[in-house]
Amino acid sequence: AEEIIINKKIGEIKHVDAAFSSSLTDLFQGIPLSESNNHTFQPHASTWSDPNKGGGYGWGQLSHMFAGVLKITHLEPDQVFCLSVPSPTNVDYTNAVSMKFSNGATGSFSGSAFVPKDFGGTFYITVHGTLGVLYLDMEVKRERLFVRLNNGDNINYEIEEGDGAFSYGTKEA
């Protein structure tokens, strides 16, 4: 995706939208992550539920999404506005972020902890340019990267299952 954007295949970036959602309402309420019940080492729930420790969806999850957005676009945020829904521990369950970049482009970003357990969540980035649009979808079992150009051309890039949202994890060589 980064190479496509650097090579100006979609032209000058005018807008970016992205969303990241995952099943973490328990953590933001101060309840330990149920998926770690059988693990030898369980993370402290306060890691995600204490506002003084950077808890909440924005710090804990959207940081991953923004790393992806900024990595592939090379844009620099200039102005940012955010609305959120607080949890009982006063950290954010959701985020609705509007952004203006230094090149004049705009961005609309969303994050939510309200996803059913065992779903895996959503992670996508869409980059709108003067020549076309890049779609990068990293939802588990729906991984895809494609470009739709204004001239009618479509370019599809194969992404293997598991090489999307989990691709930044460790794998056996």
Regions found by a protein language model. Name each.
Residues 1-81, 88:
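Predominantly a Rossmann-like dinucleotide-binding segment in NAD(P)-dependent oxidoreductases
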Residues 9-10, 163-173:
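Short, intrinsically disordered, charge-balanced linker/junction segments flanking boundaries
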Residues 18-20, 111, 129, 159:
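Active-site donor-binding loop signature of nucleotide-sugar glycosyltransferases
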Residues 102, 149-152:
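C-terminal helix-rich "cap/oligomerization" subdomain common to oxidoreductases
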